[in-house]
From Swiss-Prot:
Matching Pfam families: Ribosomal_S9 (PF00380)
Assigned keywords, A-Z: Ribonucleoprotein, Ribosomal protein
GO biological process, one term: translation
PROSITE patterns membership: RIBOSOMAL_S9
Organism placement in taxonomy: Bacteria, Pseudomonadati, Pseudomonadota, Alphaproteobacteria, Hyphomicrobiales
Protein name per the record: Small ribosomal subunit protein uS9
Protein family according to the UniProt entry: Belongs to the universal ribosomal protein uS9 family.
NCBIfam families to which the protein is assigned, alphabetical: PRK00132.1
SUPFAM superfamilies the UniProt entry points to: Ribosomal protein S5 domain 2-like (SSF54211)
Organism of provenance: Allorhizobium ampelinum (strain ATCC BAA-846 / DSM 112012 / S4)
GO MF term (any one): RNA binding
């Protein structure tokens, strides 16, 4: 049977092991994070600024021409109600445009939580901090695609 002092120790041990989210910023005052989606990997830096988003050295409307992809990029900043307060610099490699947009969104979300830990609950609730692990299913031999079989002829 556990005595009272061991129960107190257990409580303090649990408090100590709970993750404390601290601000992680480099010497220039930027928060860095990586985001992933499908085969795309994005390296993202967030710093206080005017709301400019740069992807691979180009403004994001130039790099991501489709309005849907532009909206995906802005979702975390809008959800956190920080529009026009942060400059974002991202370099993204691999995958297609949709995967790259998702990777940058994931990176922006993580970097915002490193810069301002208070935003974590809002972004977590919106699902921006969760890594979307869905990737293309591989093609199997004996099949036309991943699941589609070759046409079957009875006679």
């Amino acid at each position: 049977m556990a005595d009272l002092s061991s129960l107190k120790d257990l409580g303090t041990a649990q408090e100590a092991s709970a993750p404390v989210h601290v601000r992680k910023v480099d010497a220039q005052g930027r928060a860095y994070a990586t985001g992933k989606r499908k085969n795309a990997i994005a390296r993202v830096w967030v710093k206080p600024g005017t709301g400019k988003i740069t992807v691979n050295g180009r403004d994001f409307p130039v790099y991501f021409a489709r309005p849907v992809l532009q909206m995906i990029l802005q979702q975390p900043v809008v959800a956190a109600a920080r529009t026009g307060q942060f400059d974002v610099i991202a370099t993204v490699t691999g995958g297609g445009l949709s995967g790259q947009a998702g990777a940058v969104r994931h990176g922006i979300s993580k970097a915002l939580t490193y810069f301002e830990p208070g935003l974590r609950s809002v972004l977590k609730k919106g699902g921006f901090l969760t890594r979307d692990s869905r990737v293309v299913e591989r093609k199997k031999y004996g099949k036309a695609k991943a699941r589609r079989s070759f046409q079957f002829s009875k006679r």
